[in-house]
A protein has these predicted regions:
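Alpha-helical metal-binding/catalytic segments enriched in His/Glu/Asp
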Residues: 113
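Periplasmic OmpA-like peptidoglycan-binding domain that tethers envelope proteins to the cell wall
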Residues: 40-52, 82-84, 91-104, 117, ...
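Catalytic cores of peptidoglycan-degrading enzymes
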Residues: 120
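Short beta-alpha junctions and helix-cap segments that line functional grooves
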Residues: 67-69, 110, 178-182
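Juxtamembrane linker/hinge segments adjacent to a transmembrane helix in small membrane proteins
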Residues: 1-79, 85-87, 202, 206-224
Length: 225
């Protein structure tokens, strides 16, 4: 009798196509709201970390002058901390892969901020582009920039940064100058350290109905701190 009753029991009505669409829209809206909240919190944490680094630099006499060689901003990829050369104040001796004493001080200061956050990090080395060569670089600049990035990684790890957090170490030689209109400017020689976003702006840019390059995304969302 039980089986007869269950056979005769009316089936629950299936959701109409309109209801299915509404449920999908609600789920998508909820997911988008969550992504936006994660991005908002992450941006606030990055801003706090950047301010913490600036204060630390100013409070330590041996670092205060070096603060001019730090550029900190938020990009689609994350919180970017760049250690740049200045005229007469290089981070590496000529053709050397080892950061000099000045660079090591800065890297150890940066490590304290990195250790405040859980994000993975990427480290990129850059050399100067040759003047008049349309951003071409000397052949040995590729391994040189990579080796400098790796040497910087080792110093960060010796200062307490967990090796498991290092997502990428690379060298771009002079192919990505900080100042494209002045490729021989000392500041183009730099180490770029990025605390990567976990729910980032780049992923949001990729969902745009129009194709968006990383450069276009960066130009739209870059946020100097």
């Amino acid at each position: 009798a039980q089986s007869v009753i269950s056979e005769l029991a009316p089936e629950a009505p299936a959701d109409s196509p309109q209801e299915v669409g509404q449920n999908a829209n609600l789920a998508a809206a909820s997911e988008e709201a969550l992504r936006e909240e994660i991005a908002r919190r992450e941006a606030a944490e990055f801003a706090s970390a950047a301010e913490s680094l600036r204060q630390a630099m100013q409070s330590m006499p041996e670092l205060a002058e070096l603060s001019k060689q730090l550029i900190i901003d938020q990009t689609p990829e994350g919180l970017r901390i760049q250690l740049v050369d200045q005229e007469g104040r290089s981070m590496f001796d000529n053709n050397s892969v080892q950061p000099n004493a000045r660079a090591q001080l800065l890297l150890r200061a940066v490590s304290r901020v990195i250790n405040q956050l859980p994000n993975r990090i990427s480290i990129t080395g850059h050399t100067s582009a040759q003047p008049g060569s349309n951003r071409a670089t000397l052949p040995n600049d590729w391994p040189l920039s990579s080796a400098r990035a790796n040497a910087s990684r080792l110093i960060l790890q010796s200062a307490g940064v967990d090796a498991d957090r290092v997502y990428q170490v690379s060298g771009k030689a002079g192919s990505d100058p900080l100042y494209p209109d002045d490729p021989d400017l000392p500041a183009n020689r730099r180490i770029s350290i990025v605390l990567l976003r976990e729910g980032g702006t780049w992923e949001h840019c990729q969902q745009s109905p129009e194709p968006v390059s990383r450069q276009e995304c960066a130009a739209t969302h870059a946020n100097p701190l």
